[in-house]
Amino acid sequence: MSVIRVTDLDLKGKRVFIRADLNVPVKDGKVTSDARISASMGTIDYCLKQGGKVMVTSHLGRPEEGVWSEENSLKPVADNISERLGKPARLIKDWVDGNFDVAEGELVILENCRFNKGEKKNADETAQKYAKLCDVFVMDAFGTAHRAEASTYGIAKYAPVACAGILLTEELDALTKALLNPARPMVAIVGGSKVSTKLTVLESLSEKVDQLVVGGGIANTFLKAAGQNVGKSLCEDDLVPIAKMLMEKMAKRNATIPIAVDVVVGKKFDASEPAVLKNADAVTDDDMIFDIGPKSARELSDIIMKAGTVVWNGPVGVFEFDQFGEGTKTIAMAIADTDAFTLAGGGDTIAAIQKYDIYDRVSYISTAGGAFLEFLEGKKLPAVEILEQRAAGSR
């Protein structure tokens, strides 16, 4: 990734505009989970220490454009950052036309960028106004890098200098290492309820990986494609032919999609539903598959332990209910123990990592959802592409 990095620049006395991803959950005016703020502080602290006049903005929620609302205000975020810095970080409400000053080594929070007209549509006029506020634009919001908006793309076109922040650089380096130059064997684990929502990811990965592990509802469609009864389990019958095609395509190049040999079933989706272990060929018409069995989990664990690279996106069972969580737990522990480079991303995956307490034992955890998936699909991320173009133009 040939982009200018913020750490390559002299920021002293410069007006620095950071687009971060501070879209955090808020309840009763307080931030309830500040992982994204923590992840963004590296870039913010760096720019402050370098003597920049630092402005940071983000979206929060989905407000109506052009209308300020308390529920989508960045005030709780500004309070959280002020506490971290031990000094106030001013929240500036109407900032698009300037009308505010920032001192060297000071941080101001620019109110939710989605309150601004033209933000979502990437309006040129809005982007140019943003660009006039700064000498250096720092894109650090990997979570929105797949969207071309005024604060992620437009400003990068017009700012005097456009660069990548520390978090964005780390994300891109980790994804590049895992997907573009992977150590072999390469294993991808893709879970989730539906093949249809991850179809392009599965198709793209099926051409790259040595083993493509499918989990959750997705695995049921592949089980059916392998000729097994899946009972009343979540399964997309219309995509069974595509599952077969992916299995055949991978087999032709000696790669595999491992199919479960045993499963854990119940009769209904309920936290108190008893778990029943069955061989995969013994599922009855009224069963619902909620997890893989211990034999299948051991097989997958062995695959992970022998891997050079593991990409994890999605659990392999209904791990929210402990009786259907053993498969995901086994996989999580193998990912923690393997010598492979491990990359994980997606909300459910991060929830599993937290539940099984392996956060510090995964090589890299991506904070992004949609952008992570689009990178896995092999798509170009617009906000990264524009940084590459600006870097090429500055040589």
UniProtKB/Swiss-Prot annotation:
It is found in: Cytoplasm. Coiled coil: none annotated. InterPro entries: Phosphoglycerate_kinase (IPR001576), Phosphoglycerate_kinase_CS (IPR015911), Phosphoglycerate_kinase_N (IPR015824), Phosphoglycerate_kinase_sf (IPR036043). The keyword S-adenosyl-L-methionine does not apply. ATP binds at K198, E320, G346, G347, D348, T349. One of its GO terms (biological process) is glycolytic process. PROSITE patterns: PGLYCERATE_KINASE (PS00111). This is Phosphoglycerate kinase. GO terms for molecular function: ADP binding; ATP binding; phosphoglycerate kinase activity. It comes from Nitrosospira multiformis (strain ATCC 25196 / NCIMB 11849 / C 71). It is an enzyme of class 2 (transferase). Keywords: ATP-binding, Cytoplasm, Glycolysis, Kinase, Nucleotide-binding, Transferase. Pathway: Carbohydrate degradation; glycolysis; pyruvate from D-glyceraldehyde 3-phosphate: step 2/5. Belongs to the phosphoglycerate kinase family. One of its GO terms (cellular component) is cytosol. Substrate binds at D21, L22, N23, R36, H59, L60, G61, R62, R114, R147. Monomer. Pfam families: PGK (PF00162). It catalyses: (2R)-3-phosphoglycerate + ATP = (2R)-3-phospho-glyceroyl phosphate + ADP.
